[in-house]
């Protein structure tokens, strides 16, 4: 296998940089078109009904037809909105979604017309933090859309989205810390190279579980789609949007799904490395084959998003916030402490069994502390006395039929 040379980044000819940029853009657009169609097919299969099957053979052109339909719709601007912010919000939401994919490694070094280049647009010493920062900008589009719409429900959806991102981005960043400790770098290509022997999903399983939960919350997908809850907020932050403006919000959502799936592949599933036992074969991790393994792993996470939407109901808002602040963040902090201790002991020459034993002991202590705290809270909570029905309530007036009957009886 051929790992990208960090010195290659920034030295590609302009036409190669342009070609890779267009390739990433086309990859994301095709992934979005396919994901929308496959999601509708999967939901139909899981709900015992037919999915889209009218436009094109077996409904394969349904996503394209929906895009054309949205493009041809009239772009209405409701009265009372802050027009320029209202129009800028979808753009602010969709641009960071594409920008985050610039540092995702999709393969090793390949030859393009005699030029050696990496299947990655660029890389940074803090590439993962760049992704975290850029994806955070996208929430401004949602918040501004809710504020500029001049309506109550979009405003509530925007506020929910901001609280959601603040809550779950902390847990997501903490899950990154364990990867940084093991890899010794924040560069995405360096993290992939560090997983040559063992993928981090094996070594850092709690971090992987925290990240998977947080990435669903970050992308506003079911069961964490509270900013656009149809039963509560009509359509949430994009209630007042139609035509291409609404399509841009949908595009940003699916591109963000692809980005967080690609980041999960990079951090925990070995990136573009071939899975075992395919990796044993000669040439499995060289040439253009890594692009195939990378795409397959990304689609596994996209199917996971679809599976969650089809099977789980939407969470209650207070339960959703409690999951982020009371479970994910404390678990992440405890796990980082364990990873730091075991990694330090390993660097000092202690054997792996001793390190594992210490790690298990620390994990047991943290688990017992959390269980003891929850039991203590359960003891403090006592049931409130049941008030009699109608006590303190407004008296119910008699029905007209009963009133007339009483008057007739008195007469």
Curated annotation (Swiss-Prot):
Reactions accelerated catalytically: a quinone + NADH + 5 H(+)(in) = a quinol + NAD(+) + 4 H(+)(out)
Coiled coil region boundaries: none
EC number: 7.1.1.-
InterPro entries (alphabetical): NADH_UbQ_OxRdtase_su1/FPO, NADH_UbQ_OxRdtase_su1_CS
Keyword Acetylation: no
Bilayer-crossing regions: 18-38, 84-104, 124-144, 165-185, 198-218, 260-280, 288-308, 321-341, 352-372
Gene Ontology cellular component list: plasma membrane
GO molecular function, one term: oxidoreductase activity, acting on NAD(P)H, quinone or similar compound as acceptor
Chief site of localization: membrane
Assigned keywords, A-Z: Cell membrane, Membrane, NAD, Quinone, Translocase, Transmembrane, Transmembrane helix
Membrane topology: Multi-pass membrane protein
Function: NDH-1 shuttles electrons from NADH, via FMN and iron-sulfur (Fe-S) centers, to quinones in the respiratory chain. The immediate electron acceptor for the enzyme in this species is believed to be menaquinone. Couples the redox reaction to proton translocation (for every two electrons transferred, four hydrogen ions are translocated across the cytoplasmic membrane), and thus conserves the redox energy in a proton gradient. This subunit may bind ubiquinone.
Subunit structure: NDH-1 is composed of 14 different subunits. Subunits NuoA, H, J, K, L, M, N constitute the membrane sector of the complex.
PANTHER family recorded: NADH DEHYDROGENASE SUBUNIT 1, NADH-UBIQUINONE OXIDOREDUCTASE CHAIN 1
Name of this protein: NADH-quinone oxidoreductase subunit H
Organism: Mycolicibacterium vanbaalenii (strain DSM 7251 / JCM 13017 / BCRC 16820 / KCTC 9966 / NRRL B-24157 / PYR-1) (Mycobacterium vanbaalenii)
Gene behind this protein: nuoH
């Amino acid at each position: 296998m051929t790992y990208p040379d960090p010195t290659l980044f920034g030295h590609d000819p302009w036409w190669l940089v342009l070609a890779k940029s267009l390739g990433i853009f086309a990859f994301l657009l095709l992934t979005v078109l396919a994901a929308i169609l496959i999601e509708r097919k999967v939901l139909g299969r899981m709900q015992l009904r037919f999915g889209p099957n009218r436009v094109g053979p077996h409904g394969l052109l349904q996503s394209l037809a929906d895009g054309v339909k949205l493009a041809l719709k009239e772009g209405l601007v409701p009265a009372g909105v802050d027009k320029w912010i209202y129009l800028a919000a979808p753009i602010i939401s969709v641009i960071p979604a594409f920008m985050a994919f610039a540092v995702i490694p999709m393969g090793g070094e390949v030859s393009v017309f005699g030029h050696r280049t990496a299947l990655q647009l660029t890389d940074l010493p803090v590439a993962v933090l760049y992704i975290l920062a850029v994806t955070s900008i996208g929430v401004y589009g949602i918040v501004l859309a809710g504020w500029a719409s001049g309506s109550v429900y979009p405003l509530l959806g925007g506020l929910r989205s901001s609280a959601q991102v603040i809550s779950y981005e902390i847990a997501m960043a903490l899950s990154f810390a364990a990867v940084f400790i093991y890899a010794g770098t924040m560069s995405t290509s360096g993290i992939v190279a560090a997983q040559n022997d063992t993928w981090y999903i094996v070594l850092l399983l709690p971090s992987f579980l925290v990240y998977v939960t947080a990435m669903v919350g970050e992308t506003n997908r079911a069961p964490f789609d509270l900013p656009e809850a149809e039963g509560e907020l009509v359509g949430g932050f994009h209630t007042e949007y139609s035509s291409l403006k609404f399509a841009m919000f949908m595009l940003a959502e699916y591109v963000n799904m692809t980005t967080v799936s690609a980041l999960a592949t990079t951090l925990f599933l070995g990136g573009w490395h071939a899975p075992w036992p395919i990796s044993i074969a000669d040439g499995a991790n060289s040439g253009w084959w890594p692009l195939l393994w990378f795409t397959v792993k990304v689609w596994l996470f996209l199917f996971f998003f679809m599976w969650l939407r089809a099977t789980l109901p939407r969470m209650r808002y207070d339960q959703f916030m409690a999951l982020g602040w009371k479970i994910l963040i404390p678990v992440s902090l405890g796990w980082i402490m364990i990873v730091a201790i075991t990694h330090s002991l390993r660097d000092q020459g202690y054997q792996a069994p001793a390190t594992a034993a210490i790690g298990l002991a620390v994990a047991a202590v943290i688990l017992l502390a959390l269980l003891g705290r929850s039991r203590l809270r359960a003891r403090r909570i006592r049931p409130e006395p049941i008030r009699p029905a109608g006590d303190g309530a407004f008296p119910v007036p008699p029905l007209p039929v009963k009133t007339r009957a009483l008057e007739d009886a008195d007469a």
